[in-house]
Amino acid sequence: MIQKQKGFSAPVLALSVWTAALAEEMQTGISPRGMIIHGAVQALLLTCISGVFSACWQRAAMQGVWLFSAGAWFLAELFGTVMQAQNICQQEFRSMALIGLLPLLLWAGWCIPPSGWDAPARVLWWFVLLGGLVCLTGLAGQMDWAHLLTADAVQLARWPRVPLYAEYLFWPLLAGYEEPRSMSWLPWLTFLAQAGLTAGMCLVFGAADYPEQELLRAWSADVFSRMDALLLLIWLTCAIFRIGFLCAAVRTVWQRAVQCGKGAVK
């Protein structure tokens, strides 16, 4: 048996998924109604799959497979998040600072215990909520609700692409044993992020055929006209958090693999 220990909290895993979902590239030709209906169906299926995995992962015969798969998947997501954050830094701020900061982030992620990520995650969630409120305030005057009633907005021809993150399936490895079956709802965060972005693009531009940054650039409130830089900085801060968290997740999976190996030897 793997030794029981305190793991990552729900706010930590939720912030990681939310940050990744906001960075997903928008699909063209997806209507708000199609995103809501089809996206909800896919989120429900992913929730069921997550529940099945949470019930089966502790089987001794499969623990090695779960641990290897989780480690490889978290490493892949770590690489992807670094590339996304660096692209934003270079395109929007003409900066390579993230590359210089990366060794420190990886070191911090490896050293900080799972319980140490809860407090910063809760603080960042307040910044995320504040940023969302500021964004809605600046875009409210540009939204045209009639756009939701057009033929393109109500068609259901295409299914949206719902990303699959390692946190959906391997949260039992990260959450410890204190919150059993409590995080199968993580796919709904991705659904809410994608549905909100699609609806916002349709309300402002009439179609969801533009990059997400265009929605931020459309923000205006008399004196300030480039609030997108501040909102992007909030996302970058969350991305830096996710980079450290994914490194900590890899460390946690590695530790559990070592414990599992020792238990098998005994």
Task: Name each region found by the language model.
Residues 204-228:
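Membrane-interface interhelical connector segments
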Residues 29-30, 112-124, 170-192, 254-260:
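Hydrophobic, small-residue-rich membrane helices and short re-entrant helix-turn-helix hairpins
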Residues 48-58, 108-115, 139, 175-180:
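Structural signal for the C-terminal ends of transmembrane alpha-helices
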Residues 62, 96-101, 106-139:
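Membrane-interface loop-to-helix entry segments
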Residues 16-108:
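Membrane helical hairpin/interfacial module
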Residues 80-87, 115, 244-252:
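Short helix-terminus and kink motifs of transmembrane alpha helices
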Residues 5-24, 38-46, 69-81, 98, ...:
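Hydrophobic, membrane-embedded alpha-helices of multi-pass small-molecule transporters
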Residues 262-266:
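Long, low-complexity C-terminal extensions of enzymes
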